């Protein structure tokens, strides 16, 4: 993010930015780039991956509820139903249609993942209110996330260098998954409604399935078609507005 900011502006921040702008964006970075992942990775470490993945995808639903509070967006009951069906489609895809695969590990893991999901939902909603230019905003939120992660590391763990085998995936993850993707997500948040943004998130498991099946030759289940169709229909309903 620092390199992108430098190439676009030479690390020159908008002179009109005030102290409260910086603090607000650093706070958002703590929510969406640090606390979210800390709670989420704790869940994956301690709990069942299917359980965690399902609870993780509650954040778009939480985002819609928060949008009605902070952004005063009207809760369209039909869109809410469509989003709920989209979530059910995700549930079918993740469990391959077998609900018995869900094993709840314990209340601590569930609350941790739900809290992490809430952090990212709140981050997404409050990001719509930011007046900072998108590249500067991206730099500030990752800087805020770095500060919070460093403090958490100092208080609760110790620093360890990744192995050579782990280094490349970490770099790719940092640049694309937790880097460039944020710019597109923030751009979408400022362009369309909260509900439309939320339903688009449900496309990600469908896209992931395509890559996994194509590149890793994973087994294909009929439930993928059923769940994916539900997600697609729900999404098309929510995105029927012209600006979507």
Task: Please place each PLM-identified region on the residue numbering.
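Helix-helix packing/entry segments at the starts of transmembrane helices
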Residues: 50-58, 127-146, 175-214
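Cytoplasmic-side transmembrane-helix entry/capping segments in multi-pass membrane proteins
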Residues: 20-28, 75-87, 132-142
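Hydrophobic transmembrane alpha-helices of multi-pass small-molecule transport proteins
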Residues: 2, 66, 75-97, 142, ...
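Hydrophobic residues within alpha-helical transmembrane segments
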Residues: 27, 31, 58, 80-84, ...
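Hydrophobic/aromatic residues within transmembrane alpha-helices
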Residues: 43, 69-75, 130, 137, ...
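Transmembrane alpha-helices of multi-pass small-molecule transport proteins
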Residues: 1-35, 62-63, 118-123, 139-157, ...
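Juxtamembrane helix-entry segments on the extracytoplasmic side of multipass membrane proteins
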Residues: 17-23, 95-117, 154-172, 219-229
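Specific transmembrane alpha-helical segments of multi-pass solute transporters/efflux pumps
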Residues: 9-51, 55-56, 92, 174-192
